[in-house]
C-alpha cells in the first residue's frame, strides 16, 4: 500500500534513542506490562521532510492547521499568544517533545514512561492517507469466532508482545497500551492544559483511530491485511460474558489482572459499579438491555448527548461524557478489572493500564460499533458538524512505524476506513421499558422543591425533589426541534474513586433501584478513577444531562408543569455534591 510504506526517514538513529532516554528511563527499569491502545508495526523509517503525504482536504494548510502545528507539534508558541483565534480552536495533536509523567492517581505516578518514541522530523509529520483497499475487514462478534480465527488473533498478539523486547518499538504491545496511558492519564498538555480524550466529544473518534492502527499492526504481523479485531458483543445476551478466547490461561489474549469472580461465563452487569450485587441472571440481562435502550435511544436523540460535551482548545478537560462512554463503556472497564486484588483496579479498571489487557481492544470495538448502530436508529442521530470537532487531531504510528497526524473528520465512515462489523441482532432496539411502578402521577406537593434540596453537599442517601418544567404539553414539532434536558450542574466528586448514581422520574425514594426495566428509570451517571495532573485536590466537576422527552411521554407526564425526580447513589455517593438541577430545552 503506497501510503503505509511512505518513509519518514529518521535523520539519525542516535537522536531517536537519545530523545527517549530521558522520558523512558524508568520504562526500561520496570519491564512490567504496559498498555494497549493503538499503534501498528514495523521498522522506524523517518525522513526529514516527508510532508508530501497529505490528505485531500489538507492540501492547503489553513490557519486552523497552522495553529495546530505551532501549538501542538512544535510547542513553540504559548496558548496565550494564540488566544484571539479562539473562534476556530480544534484540539491539536499532542506535543510529543513535552510528553511528561502519567499519573495513576493523585500523587502516584506511573512507574514507567507512557510517552511514544519521538520521530526525528517531529515538526513535519504528514497527514495519514488511507491505503488502497481490496476488501473490507469485517470485525466478528468475539463469542462466535471459530478456532482458526482465534489462532490467528493469538499469533498476532503474541508477535506484538515479542516486539516489547525493544521498548521503543512503537508497534510493541506495551507501546500500544501506552498510547491510552499517555492520552488519558495526563502525560500530554495542549494549550497549557492537560489533554484528556475521555469525558468529551473526542472519546469516539480517538478510540476509533486507536483501534484502526492497532488492527492494522496485528494484521501486518501475520501478513493478513484482512485481519479484523473481534468485538465483545455485550449488548446481546449471547455476548454478555467474557468471550471464551480471552479466558484461556496461557494464551496471549489472557490477562491475569482481571476480576477472578467474573470468569467462566459469569454474566456481565453493564451497570456494574464496583460492588457485587446478588441480582438474578435474568434480571441482570434485562437491566442490561434496558440500559442499552436508554443510552442509545431515550437519552441520545441528538448528537451532543451521544458524543459528549464540546472540548475546543483552551477549555478545561473532561467537560462531560456522552451516553455510551458513561454506560456501558465505563462499567465494563470496572467489571473486567481486578479491583478485588489490585489497588487501582488494574488492568481494565484504570485508564493507565487498560490497554495492557487484550480484551480492551475487543471491548472498544463494540463501543465503536455502537457509533455505527446509533446512526442507523434514525431521527437526528448523525455525526457532529462542528469544525472544532472535525479538525481535532491525534498522533499515531502506522504498521510500518511511520508517524502520522490524523483528523476526526476522516474517521466518520468506518467503511471508508476499510472496516465494518459482522451484523448481530440488536434486541435492545425494541426494549423500551413500559412497566410502571407508579400508577398516575406521584404527589409532587409532598416532595421538597429543587431549590430546597440543592445545592446538595453529599449524595449519601436516596433523595427526591420536585422540579418545574420550562414548558408542558409540547407539540410534536416542538419536540422535534428541541429536546427536554434534565441537567445536573456542577456534579463534583473525587476522580480517584468509582462513582455511580441512578436517576428516576415520577417515583419517590422508596423505588427499587435494582430493577431498571421500568418506565421511570431515566438513566445513570458513572465515573472510572482517573486523575488530572494539575488537579491537586482531585475533585472533578461535570455537567450531567439526561434527555427526558421520551420518558415524559412513557410516564404520561407531558402535560404536567412539575415532576418528581429521585436520585439513588449506588457507589461513592458520599463524595458526590451537586450545585443545582434544572430542566432546559436544547436544540437538537
UniProtKB/Swiss-Prot annotation:
Cross-link for 2'-(S-cysteinyl)-histidine (Cys-His), residue positions: 184-198
PANTHER family, per the entry: POLYPHENOL OXIDASE F, CHLOROPLASTIC, TYROSINASE FAMILY MEMBER
Keyword field contains Plastid: yes
Pfam families reported in the protein's UniProt record: PPO1_DWL, PPO1_KFDV, Tyrosinase
Family the entry assigns: Belongs to the tyrosinase family.
Protein's name in the database: Catechol oxidase B, chloroplastic
The EC number(s) this enzyme carries: 1.10.3.1
Role description: Catalyzes the oxidation of mono- and o-diphenols to o-diquinones.
Cofactor: Cu(2+)
Origin species: Solanum tuberosum
Organelle transit peptide: 1-88
Binding site for Cu cation A: 180, 198, 207
Origin superkingdom: Eukaryota
UniProt KW keywords: Chloroplast, Copper, Disulfide bond, Metal-binding, Oxidoreductase, Plastid, Thioether bond, Thylakoid, Transit peptide
Binding note for cofactor: Binds 2 copper ions per subunit.
Binding residue positions for Cu cation B: 329, 333, 364
